[in-house]
A protein has these predicted regions:
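N-terminal periplasmic/intermembrane-space "pro-region" immediately following the signal or transit peptide
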Residues: 19-73, 80-83, 218
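Bacterial Sec-dependent N-terminal signal peptides
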Residues: 1-24
C-alpha cells in the first residue's frame, strides 16, 4: 500500500513538473513565437496572435532554446526536353519520372535574449533525375544552405551575419514552405543561383552581413547588406543589396517572406530595392497583397518589376558586361484561397526581355542576341491544403517560350511545357 501511495505521489509530482515546464497557454504561445522567429522558413502568420510581442517582452523567464524542423518537396513530373532551353530535334518529346526535389533540415535557436541562430541544409540536386551519363541520381550528399547569426540590438536595428538568402525584391526573399506557386520563379535568381553563376551564389544565398529594422510602428522595414558576391581574387568590390518595404495594413516581420497566407493575411505591402557589385546593378519595385476578398476566402497578388545590367566596360577586371546583359524582368502571381474547401487556384506570368548593348552582345548581332536570350514563362495550378503549409498537394502546368533560330538564322517562337504533381510536408 505504501508503495502504491509513493508511486502515486511521484506520478503527481511528475505531472505537476510537466505542467510547470509547459507553462500553460501563454508559455506555449511564446515558444511557438520563438520557433516561428528562429526557423526562418516558417511563415510568420502561423505564430499565435499577439504571441510575438509577448515573447519579445518575456525576458525575465528567458532560457536558451533550440528548435528543429524539416521541409520536403517530392513530385511526379512530365517535361518536354526543350523546356530548359536546350532545343534539339527531340525538344517536343516528354520526359517523365519521380523526384525528391527538396529535403531540408532546419535548426534554429535562441542563444541569448537578443541573439539567435539559424541553419538549414539542402539537396544540391534532385534525387531521381536522369544524369548525363544515362544513370539515375540516387545518392546526394546534403549541403549547408543557410548558416546565420542574428543579434537584435533593438526593434529598429538588427544584424544578421552569415550565409543567407539575398535579394532586393520580395519574391526573391520568399521561404520555400510558404510558396503559392509550385516553385520559385525563373528570373529572380538568374545570376546568383549556383557557384558558376555571375554572382557566384548558392541557391540565391550569399555570405555577408545584413542590417534590418522596423520603423513607424513596424509599418516600414529596411534592409541593407554587404555580401561577397563574385569573388575572383579577394580584391573585388563587395556586393551591396538594399530594400525598403512599407506595409499599409498589418506589419510583417518575416525574414523570409510568405508567398501566400491562406486566409490569415491582412497585407498590402509595397517595396523597392537595389543590388549592385562592380559594373552590375539591379533596381526594382514590388507589390504584395494578401487579404480577405468576399466570404469565400482571400486573394493573393504578388507582382514585381526589375531593370538590370552588367554595364558596358568590358576592360575592367570586375566587369559583368559579358555576363549580365541589359534587361527588364516582369513577374505576376495571382491566386484565390477558398477557405471552406481549402483549395487555391493560381496563375503566374514572367517575362525576361533582353535589350543588350553592343559591348554586351560581343560579336553577335544585337537583335539575334536579344532574341536568343529573352524568354517568358506562364502557367497555373491548383493547390489543396490538407493542413495549411504543413501538408499540401499541388498540381501545376507551366510553359516556357523561347526564340529558336532555324538553319537559315531566322528566329521563331517555340513553347514547351512542364507538369508537376507535388507533395509538400513541413515539420516544425
Amino acid at each position: 500500500m505504501k508503495r502504491l501511495f509513493l508511486n502515486a505521489g511521484l506520478l503527481l509530482m511528475l505531472c505537476q513538473g510537466i505542467a510547470l515546464a509547459d507553462g500553460g497557454p501563454d508559455a506555449r504561445d511564446r515558444k511557438a513565437a520563438r520557433k516561428v522567429r528562429v526557423l526562418r522558413e516558417i511563415p510568420g502568420y502561423l505564430a499565435p496572435k499577439d504571441s510575438v510581442t509577448a515573447a519579445e517582452k518575456a525576458e525575465d523567464d528567458f532560457k536558451p532554446s533550440i528548435h528543429v524542423g524539416a521541409i520536403v518537396h517530392m513530385f511526379a513530373s512530365a517535361e518536354q526536353s526543350g523546356f530548359g532551353g536546350n532545343v534539339t530535334d527531340k525538344a517536343s518529346d516528354w520526359n517523365k519520372g519521380f523526384s525528391l526535389y527538396r529535403a531540408r533540415v532546419l535548426v534554429g535557436g535562441q542563444l541569448s535574449r537578443k541573439g539567435s541562430f539559424f541553419m538549414e541544409t539542402e539537396l544540391p540536386s534532385p534525387i531521381g533525375i536522369q544524369l548525363g551519363d544515362s544513370t539515375k541520381n540516387v545518392k546526394v550528399a546534403p549541403i549547408l544552405l543557410d548558416c546565420q547569426y542574428e543579434y537584435a540590438f533593438s526593434n529598429a536595428f538588427q544584424l544578421i551575419a552569415g550565409m543567407q538568402l539575398v535579394s532586393s525584391n520580395r519574391n526573391g526573399l520568399q521561404g520555400a514552405a510558404g510558396l503559392m506557386a509550385n516553385d520559385f520563379t525563373y528570373f529572380q535568381y538568374p545570376y546568383n543561383l549556383f557557384a558558376n553563376s555571375p554572382l557566384q551564389g548558392n541557391f540565391g544565398r550569399d555570405l555577408g552581413v545584413n542590417a534590418r529594422g522596423f520603423l513607424l510602428k513596424d509599418k516600414l522595414e529596411y534592409r541593407l547588406g554587404l555580401f561577397t558576391g563574385r569573388n575572383l581574387d579577394g580584391q573585388a568590390p563587395l556586393r551591396i543589396v538594399g530594400r525598403v518595404a512599407y506595409n499599409f495594413l498589418d506589419p510583417e516581420k518575416d525574414y523570409y517572406y510568405a508567398g501566400t497566407k491562406l486566409g490569415a493575411g491582412n497585407t498590402i505591402a509595397w517595396g523597392a530595392g537595389f543590388d549592385t557589385q562592380g559594373s552590375y546593378y539591379n533596381v526594382g519595385t514590388d507589390l504584395f497583397i494578401d487579404k480577405k476578398a468576399g466570404d469565400a476566402g482571400s486573394v493573393t497578388l504578388n507582382a514585381a518589376f526589375q531593370y538590370m545590367t552588367g554595364g558596358t566596360n568590358v576592360n575592367s577586371k570586375y566587369t559583368f558586361a559579358r555576363q549580365i546583359p541589359r534587361q527588364t524582368v516582369q513577374f505576376l502571381e495571382l491566386g484565390y484561397y477558398f477557405k471552406k474547401t481549402r483549395i487555391q487556384p493560381w496563375v503566374r506570368y514572367e517575362n525576361q526581355n533582353i535589350s543588350a548593348t553592343k559591348e554586351q552582345a560581343g560579336s553577335e548581332l544585337i537583335d539575334n542576341f536579344d532574341k536568343a536570350k529573352s524568354s517568358s514563362v506562364y502557367g497555373g495550378g491548383l493547390n489543396y491544403f490538407f493542413n495549411g503549409s504543413a501538408t499540401n498537394l499541388r498540381l501545376s502546368y507551366v510553359a516556357r517560350k523561347h526564340n529558336v533560330a532555324d538553319a537559315g538564322g531566322a528566329y521563331s517562337s517555340k513553347t514547351y511545357g512542364q507538369v508537376w504533381l507535388q507533395v509538400q510536408f513541413f515539420l516544425f
